[in-house]
Swiss-Prot record:
Subunit field text: Part of the 50S ribosomal subunit.
Protease listed as a keyword: no
Pfam families: KOW (PF00467), ribosomal_L24 (PF17136)
rRNA-binding among keywords: yes
Entry keyword set: Ribonucleoprotein, Ribosomal protein, RNA-binding, rRNA-binding
Lineage, opening ranks: Bacteria, Bacillati, Bacillota, Bacilli, Bacillales
GO molecular function terms noted in the UniProt entry: rRNA binding; structural constituent of ribosome
Organism of origin: Listeria welshimeri serovar 6b (strain ATCC 35897 / DSM 20650 / CCUG 15529 / CIP 8149 / NCTC 11857 / SLCC 5334 / V8)
SUPFAM superfamilies referenced in this protein's UniProt entry, alphabetically: Translation proteins SH3-like domain (SSF50104)
Originating gene: rplX
Family annotation (InterPro entries): KOW, Rib_uL2_dom2, Ribosomal_uL24, Ribosomal_uL24_CS, Ribosomal_uL24_KOW, Translation_prot_SH3-like_sf
Annotated protein name in UniProt: Large ribosomal subunit protein uL24
Protein function: One of two assembly initiator proteins, it binds directly to the 5'-end of the 23S rRNA, where it nucleates assembly of the 50S subunit. One of the proteins that surrounds the polypeptide exit tunnel on the outside of the subunit.
Any one Gene Ontology BP term: translation
Tree of life domain: Bacteria
């Protein structure tokens, strides 16, 4: 998967197209990511000990990883991600600027 937790990404398709946010969680087996403030859905909860009131909550839902692009740390524009072997480590590289993403 080309994005990891903590990356800044931009949504390129769907109802939140054009918005950007930070990746809160990545689910590689399902090819989905959870992005801060993106793909908000209403979740209905029953009253419980933790939430005695119950009600409707707004929570983020996962979005497919193909619908997001990583934001280039150098230019601030969305970019595709490539991989290079530097020394004995495989690092992610921004295709637009050639900037190494993994530090």
């Amino acid at each position: 998967m080309h994005v990891k937790k903590g990356d800044k990404v931009k949504v390129i398709t769907g109802k939140d197209k054009g918005k950007s946010g930070k990746v809160l969680a990545a689910f590689p087996k399902k090819d989905r990511v959870l992005i801060e403030g993106i793909n908000m859905v209403k979740k209905h909860t029953k009253p419980s000990n933790i939430n005695p009131q119950g009600g409707i909550l707004n929570v983020e839902a996962p979005i497919h990883v193909s619908n997001v692009m990583l934001i280039d740390p150098k230019t601030g524009e969305p970019t595709r991600v490539g991989y290079e072997v530097k020394g004995d480590k495989k690092v992610r590289v921004a295709k637009k600027s050639g900037e190494v993403i993994d530090k």
